[in-house]
């Protein structure tokens, strides 16, 4: 639908619609020559929703298109085959970091906060289904200093966790999560630490600078109980933790909270300590291993050969470096292993979120979770020193001076999929027209080579959804074909479109 406040945009959209109609008419020339009165609309009506690169269209409902009886030639054709099926779709989400929760709870009025959370998680709105929850401090902490749930003086320890408390989170993190849960009880919470308590580490500090922050040999059992206490205490507050990873980006050398945890040590921790402790406590969150970049995809391959692999539900990946095809490689080796993208942040990611979504789901991800749900205009508050995410943006931007919230390009990119593909949907066959690149943050190429990329799903109700993204510098004309019928569409450079039909 055109925005009356943007007449120029309406004229442009109308022109584009005329082009599509004209192109569709070309398909029917042969039929007209045989005496037909016009294009035969032999297929279902197709809903069209589009977001442009410059946000001149933002989840805009454009005029419907219709399948006609002929398939065009000399165009890229997205042939949808619903007889060939792949992984299930679990949903999309973002992280409720300490910074995000603080901004939502303390910098917005109650009505503004309710509007934002409803817009993000309401089933009639964006319908996000995942919230990633850092266990204590991450690189985005409103306090500006690291903390854990069991802090003691340097040189001391608390192996019985007598001082354990999630009281810090009671101020604003848990209230924000409770509001999310109230909007949609089906939202799933995934939790993991950036660092255990400092006394559990060889450097007796939160950071992992130069890889010095390793888990002490006598801290494996206390760390397992740390997870048990966290899950129980959050559960008592109405937040059921459905999944965990043992460690965010294990081995990444950081000045902010981090832990040097090798594949062997992570496998040992899961198999001998974490999984048994959770079972004894009657807790059954799904455990995901790894939680790091595609670039280090050899590490999950080593992990799945370890006996600990039987204790985990899947592998969590980050988008910042490497090739999305690593997920497909792992699937080919261990098809039962679920795969999710558990972190990706616009600003330092190799490409836009629309490109990530297509690449991730084409390569066997069941879920994609972006990084911060909300940040301020400066991309903070951050946990200094934080040079690793100094250009990060969030799904929502909070203006602390005006106490207002606005939605970023990530919001609309997520909506192009989350509003139309339901949890339990299944990816179905469709071709793509790009190859996937090996990336290195913003210094590398985009996720994929320039061209048309797409992914298709069938919802539990039988409806079909195609998400197409134009990763090129000019508009692309293409066709969508299904069961012998097709329609033609022209997609502007950098734009994303969603097609939905019964």
Features from the language model and the residues they span:
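Substrate-binding and catalytic surfaces of secreted/luminal carbohydrate-active proteins
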Residues: 43-80, 189-191, 224-242, 253-502
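Bacterial lipoprotein signal-peptidase II cleavage site
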Residues: 35-40
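C-terminal motif of bacterial Sec signal peptides marking the signal peptidase cleavage site
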Residues: 30-33
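N-terminal catalytic cores of secreted or lumenal carbohydrate-active enzymes
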Residues: 57-241
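Sec-dependent signal peptide recognition
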Residues: 16-24
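N-terminal secretory signal peptides that target proteins for export/translocation
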Residues: 1-15
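Active-site-proximal beta-alpha loop/turn segments in soluble metabolic enzymes
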Residues: 204-216, 249-262
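Short, well-ordered beta-to-alpha junction loops that form the rim of enzyme active sites
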Residues: 136, 192-194, 246-249, 292
């Amino acid at each position: 639908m055109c925005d009356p406040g943007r007449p120029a945009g309406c004229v442009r959209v109308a022109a584009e619609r005329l082009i599509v109609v004209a192109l569709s008419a070309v398909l029917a020339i042969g039929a007209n020559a045989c005496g037909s009165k016009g294009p035969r609309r032999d297929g279902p009506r197709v809903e069209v929703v589009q977001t442009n690169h410059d946000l001149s269209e933002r989840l805009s409902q454009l005029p419907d298109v219709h399948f006609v009886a002929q398939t065009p030639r000399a165009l890229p054709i997205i042939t949808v085959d619903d007889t060939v099926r792949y992984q299930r779709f679990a949903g999309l989400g973002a992280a409720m970091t300490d910074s995000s929760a603080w901004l939502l709870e303390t910098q917005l009025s109650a009505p503004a906060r309710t509007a934002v959370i409803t817009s993000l998680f309401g089933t009639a709105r964006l319908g996000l289904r995942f919230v990633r929850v850092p266990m204590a401090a991450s690189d985005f902490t409103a306090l500006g200093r690291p903390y854990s749930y069991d802090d003691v003086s340097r040189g001391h320890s608390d192996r019985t966790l007598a001082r354990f408390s999630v009281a810090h989170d009671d101020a604003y993190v848990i209230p924000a999560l409770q509001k999310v849960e109230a909007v949609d009880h089906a939202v799933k919470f995934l939790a993991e630490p950036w660092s255990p308590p400092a006394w559990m580490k060889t450097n007796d500090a939160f950071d992992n600078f130069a890889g010095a922050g390793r888990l002490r040999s006598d801290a494996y059992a206390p760390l397992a109980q740390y997870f048990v206490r966290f899950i129980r205490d959050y559960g008592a507050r109405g937040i059921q933790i459905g999944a965990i990873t043992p460690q965010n980006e294990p081995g990444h050398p950081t000045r902010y909270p981090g832990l040097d945890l090798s594949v062997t040590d992570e496998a040992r921790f899961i198999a001998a300590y974490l999984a048994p402790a959770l079972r004894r406590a009657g807790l059954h969150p799904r455990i995901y291993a790894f939680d790091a970049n595609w670039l280090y995809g050899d590490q999950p391959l080593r992990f799945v050969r370890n006996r600990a692999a039987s204790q985990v539900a899947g592998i969590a990946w980050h988008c910042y470096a490497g090739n999305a095809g690593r997920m497909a490689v792992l699937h080919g080796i261990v098809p039962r292993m679920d795969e999710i993208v558990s972190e990706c942040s616009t600003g330092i990611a190799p490409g836009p979120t629309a490109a990530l979504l297509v690449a991730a789901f084409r390569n066997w991800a069941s879920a994609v979770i972006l990084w911060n749900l909300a940040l301020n205009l400066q991309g903070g508050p951050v946990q200094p020193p934080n040079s690793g995410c100094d250009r990060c943006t969030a799904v929502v931007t909070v203006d602390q001076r005006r106490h207002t919230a606005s939605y970023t390009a990530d919001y609309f990119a997520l909506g192009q999929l989350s509003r139309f593909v339901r949890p339990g949907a299944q990816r179905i066959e469709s071709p793509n027209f790009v190859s996937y690149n090996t990336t290195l943050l913003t210094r590398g190429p985009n996720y994929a080579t320039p061209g048309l990329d797409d992914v298709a799903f069938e919802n539990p109700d039988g409806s079909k959804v195609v998400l197409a993204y134009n990763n090129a510098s000019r508009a692309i004309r293409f066709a969508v074909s299904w069961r012998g019928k097709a329609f033609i569409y022209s997609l502007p450079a950098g734009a994303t479109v969603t097609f939905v039909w019964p």
